[in-house]
From Swiss-Prot:
PANTHER family: CYTOSOLIC PHOSPHOLIPASE A2, LYSOPHOSPHOLIPASE 1-RELATED. Residues 1-19 form the signal peptide. The lineage of its organism: Eukaryota, Fungi, Dikarya, Ascomycota, Taphrinomycotina. PROSITE patterns: PLA2C (PS51210). This is Probable lysophospholipase 4. Belongs to the lysophospholipase family. Its main location: secreted. It is an enzyme of class 3 (hydrolase). It comes from Schizosaccharomyces pombe (strain 972 / ATCC 24843) (Fission yeast). One of its GO terms (biological process) is glycerophospholipid catabolic process.
């Protein structure tokens, strides 16, 4: 991993000005410099940078037309909170209603293409046809790019043939958290464009957010100056700023196709884009976790918050209520703004994606276990991180819309009652690194979920099923007392079984029998938990198990991960696997309508469904090897088939840089999902 010294130091400089009040620490502003400066392109050390930063500007500072600052508007309704008991938001329901005919048409086309022998008029019809959701896990750039490869496999716009082509267009919902939120958010906010365009024109993968202009010192300084000015706009408007503001503005420049990452572009503004107005693609949802001020770790029953184009809120615990997305940032008392005015522009697209990915903040707070006290940067990093932790700046603060709010379930306490702000953190910090939760609510009637798992599990960075185990445990533990509102979940085995049986070496189906789930042995209906299709990251053609904190990729790495994910998702373009996915998609519809299972599907379920077997011995350490060529029609179980590379993922050079920097110990110290 490579992070430029100059970029990192400037990042810390700006963070210091945010963390410390005037008078405690004086850090001069970073100025623009003339392009003809003698320092242009030089790899100067940080002491020179600090001297440069104190100079007078050679040019007038660049201006920003759009402001990052939230502002006041007249509220459209006195009571802004919508109770979850009302079901779906009216706007979301309208979107889904408009999309039903398009989804059914795409599903019919896909199923017909597979040759599955089924009566489509009975299985795919009206609003009771199959509903597909696709969930993209967290995991930094690894998750964004690996998820992008799976996205390509499902997308009919992708230039390479895929037997799964059209499944993206067949989906009703798409969700993402952390690195997966970068994928979902970047696609959605850029008019639901395709991955190839984003990779080539927007993501700028070859350069880190610390130094997006490589070794060009002048441009990097201008970049940080722009970040500083944008955050100052929000701060001067009277709003608390956190490290997430800085992170979000930096991320925006890699994810939003607009000048300086669109400081005035909001997440809710996607409603104005043509794809959204036409309901052409799945409805996007971004996920974050809540953390109370006194908590240092995320409890298993934390409230999971979701961001959609129409609203922000949670279906969980003592809240179960939503505020319109365009009014996020408005402080409410019992659902009403005290001064009859609302905040607008707080739902900045970059800030939302940064909120779902505050894991970056967490790694900074773990630095002190790894940086030596005699290091050049010890004092300055120690000072900023100590202050950030003390002031809860390792989170994303949102003005609290839930003060004095009581739901109809008075037996459950509103945990956010005492606080002026709600603190949100990375959506994977509760161990549920795949955003399945929004797709389990009964109001959305999702029949099947594709879970794209790019999680980094120890020891070698491949997913071991920990995320789906965590979701299963949350459902079993908390659904019974009605503190959460989901339909249940398929039974999921322990991680040892997942590894021992090779369930993480290929796509695996869970919950194939709708009568055998945590919801109990009942006739299958719209309240039955969805069937889960688990797609783990696996080395078909490339070692894609790079660190979560990898900040840049060259073309070889990016293309390698994209291709590997495509091959893993399609099972080497296996048309038989496409038939089995069609079976998974229609299974709940067949069960609900009491239709017989096609013979082809029975064979598929024998091959891909977990049959309830539990491992009785301890699994070996999971360290798969990459295939030098994809020569088989399906992924191996336990060991690779075909011609295998002799290099294991634990030693692969392409995923581990040979040139190490002092900060690498920080990034590698606590490899989270």
């Amino acid at each position: 991993m490579y992070v430029n010294y100059i970029g990192l130091f400037a990042f810390v400089q700006i963070s210091l000005t945010l963390a410390y009040p005037p008078g405690r620490v004086e850090i001069s502003e970073i100025y623009d410099f003339e392009e003809s400066s003698s320092y242009k392109g030089q790899d100067i050390d940080t002491s020179v940078l600090y001297t440069l930063s104190k100079r007078k500007p050679a040019l007038v500072k660049r201006s920003t037309d759009a402001s990052y600052a939230p502002f006041n508007v007249t509220c459209s309704n006195d009571n802004l909170l919508r109770p979850a008991s009302e079901g779906l938001n009216e706007g979301e329901q309208s979107y889904i209603n408009k999309r039903i005919s398009k989804v059914n048409s795409e599903l019919r086309s896909f199923i017909s293409k597979t040759g599955l022998n089924v009566d489509l008029d009975k299985v795919v019809n009206s609003s009771d046809g199959p509903r597909l959701g696709i969930a993209f896990s967290g995991g930094g750039l690894r998750a964004m790019v690996n998820g992008g490869g799976a996205f390509n496999a499902f997308d009919s716009r992708f230039e390479s043939d895929s037997p799964l082509s059209g499944l993206l267009q067949s989906a009703m919902y798409i969700s993402g958290l952390s690195g997966g939120s970068w994928l979902v958010g970047s696609v959605a906010i850029n008019n639901f464009t395709n991955i190839t365009y984003l990779r080539d024109n927007v993501w700028n993968l070859e350069h880190s957010v610390f130094a997006p202009h490589g070794d060009n010192v002048i441009e990097n300084l201008n970049y940080y100056n722009d970040l500083r000015k944008e955050i100052d706009q929000k701060k001067h408007a009277g709003f608390d700023c956190s490290l997430t503001d800085l992170w979000g503005r930096a991320l925006s420049r890699k994810l939003v196709d607009a000048e300086r990452g669109g400081p005035g572009i909001t997440y809710s503004s996607m409603r104005n884009q043509s794809w959204f107005q036409n309901a052409d693609y799945p409805y996007p949802i971004i996920v974050a976790d809540s953390r109370l001020e006194e908590e240092t770790a995320i409890p298993a029953n934390t409230s999971i918050f979701e961001f959609t184009a129409y609203e922000f809120g949670t279906w969980d615990n003592g809240i179960k209520a939503f505020i319109p997305m365009e009014y996020v940032g408005t402080h409410l008392l019992d659902g009403v703004p005290p001064d009859k005015s609302c905040i607008h522009n707080y739902d900045n697209a970059g800030f939302v994606m940064g909120t779902s990915a505050t894991l970056f903040n967490s790694f900074l707070l773990d630095w002190n276990e790894n940086v030596k006290k005699n290091d050049t940067y010890y004092d300055i990093l120690h000072a900023i991180l100590e202050d950030l932790s003390k002031h809860q700046d390792d989170i994303a603060p949102y003005p609290n819309p839930y003060q004095n709010y009581t739901t109809s379930n008075t037996s459950v306490v509103n945990a956010f009652e005492p606080y002026d702000t709600i603190d949100l953190v990375d959506g994977g910090e509760d161990r549920e690194n795949i955003p399945l939760w929004p797709l389990l609510h009964p109001q959305r009637f999702v029949d099947v979920v594709f879970a794209i798992d790019s999680t980094y599990n120890d020891p070698y960075g491949w997913p071991l099923g920990s995320s789906i185990v965590a979701t299963y445990e949350r459902v079993v533990t908390f659904n019974a007392n009605k503190s959460v509102d989901v339909r249940g979940f398929p039974y999921i085995p322990d991680e040892n079984t997942i590894i021992s049986l090779g369930l993480n070496t290929r796509p695996t189906f869970f919950g194939c029998d709708g009568k055998n789930t945590t919801a109990g042995n009942h006739d299958v209906d719209n309240n039955t938990p969805p069937l889960l299709v688990y797609f783990p990251n696996y080395p078909w053609t490339y070692y894609s198990n790079i660190s979560t904190f990898t900040m840049s990729m060259d073309d070889k790495m990016a293309n390698g991960i994209l291709e590997n994910a495509f091959m893993s998702t399609t099972q080497n373009n296996n048309e038989s696997f496409a038939v089995c996915l069609a079976c998974a998609i229609i299974q709940r519809s067949l069960e609900r309508k009491k239709l017989s299972t096609p013979t082809q599907c029975s064979s598929c379920f024998q091959e891909y469904c977990w049959d309830g077997t539990l491992a009785t011995s301890t699994a070996s350490v999971y360290d798969p090897t990459v295939m030098s060529a994809a020569t088989t029609s399906r992924a191996p179980s336990g060991t690779t088939s075909g011609t295998a590379s002799s290099t294991t993922s634990s030693s692969v050079a392409s995923a581990t840089p040979t040139h190490k920097h002092w900060w690498d110990s920080i990034f590698e110290a606590k490899e989270n999902p």
